[in-house]
Amino acid sequence: MLCIADKTFDSHLFTGTGKFASPQLMVSAIRESGSQLVTLAMKRVDLRNHNDAILAPLLEAGVTLLPNTSGAKTAEEAIFAAHLAREALGTSWLKLEIHPDARWLMPDPIETLKAAELLVKQGFTVLPYCGADPVLCKRLEEVGCAAVMPLGAPIGSNQGLETRAMLEIIIEQATIPVVVDAGIGVPSHAAQALEMGADAVLVNTAIAVADDPVMMARAFRLAVEAGALARQSGPGSRRAQAQASSPLTGFLEAYS
């Protein structure tokens, strides 16, 4: 069970809506993933038209929508987009994304913190996409963000948990949920994130561009479930040396 602000989720897997070959395939994959929270880029849909090809099937599926401000380059642009989304969709939940460089899509830490603080004061439930910076994540928590979403690797890169060392610090010090976002390329990456203590992962590209997105969505669902169970079970500590799991000499006593 995962609690963020005023909502509770059974699934620790959040999904995106970009890059799918068709809206029908998108919905099928989301259903198979078991995801209950789905991000939606406001620049890709007609927010005022609930019959929009992408928006309509999501509303029908009954998932919680998390509109994002992807495409915003400044805090001002992100705040403007947030208010449009709240008016059109009737939700104060927001994935805050500000990345001024279209090539690398790295989140702007200064503009993100600035926008997050203002949006929280304006009544939004803010989940900021940010770099794997422990100091920044703590500052975002302090201004009232409902969760933080540090990247594992650049968006869409499928590189995995390249920022693992920093993610471990973020997870250890956080008192709000940590959702690893961006760069997760295969189910094992998602399992590793949950094993190390992340509360959830957000996956889009790895599912959408797979040869069989629906099958990949199921694989991610199972991986996230396995990672969460592994964490809850209390795995043994790592050791520098070997340690036998059974006596090495007991059976030799009769021989001697």
Swiss-Prot record:
Keywords, sorted A to Z: Cytoplasm, Schiff base, Thiamine biosynthesis, Transferase
Stated family: Belongs to the ThiG family.
Gene3D superfamilies xref list: Aldolase class I (3.20.20.70)
Any one GO molecular-function label of the UniProt entry: thiazole synthase activity
A Pfam family that the UniProt record links to this protein: ThiG
GO CC terms of this entry: cytoplasm
Physiological role: Catalyzes the rearrangement of 1-deoxy-D-xylulose 5-phosphate (DXP) to produce the thiazole phosphate moiety of thiamine. Sulfur is provided by the thiocarboxylate moiety of the carrier protein ThiS. In vitro, sulfur can be provided by H(2)S.
CDD domains according to UniProt: ThiG
Residues where 1-deoxy-D-xylulose 5-phosphate binds: G156, A182, G183, N204, T205
GO BP annotations, alphabetical order: thiamine diphosphate biosynthetic process
Active site: K95
Location(s) in or outside the cell: Cytoplasm
EC number(s) recorded for this UniProt protein: 2.8.1.10
Oligomer and partners: Homotetramer. Forms heterodimers with either ThiH or ThiS.
Pathway where it operates: Cofactor biosynthesis; thiamine diphosphate biosynthesis
InterPro entries: Aldolase_TIM (IPR013785), Thiazole_synthase_ThiG (IPR033983), ThiG (IPR008867)
Protein name according to UniProt: Thiazole synthase
Catalytic reaction(s) noted: [ThiS sulfur-carrier protein]-C-terminal-Gly-aminoethanethioate + 2-iminoacetate + 1-deoxy-D-xylulose 5-phosphate = [ThiS sulfur-carrier protein]-C-terminal Gly-Gly + 2-[(2R,5Z)-2-carboxy-4-methylthiazol-5(2H)-ylidene]ethyl phosphate + 2 H2O + H(+)
Name of the gene encoding the protein in the UniProt record: thiG
HAMAP family per record: ThiG
Naturally occurring in which organism (per UniProt): Enterobacter sp. (strain 638)
PANTHER family given in the database record: THIAZOLE SYNTHASE (PTHR34266:SF2)
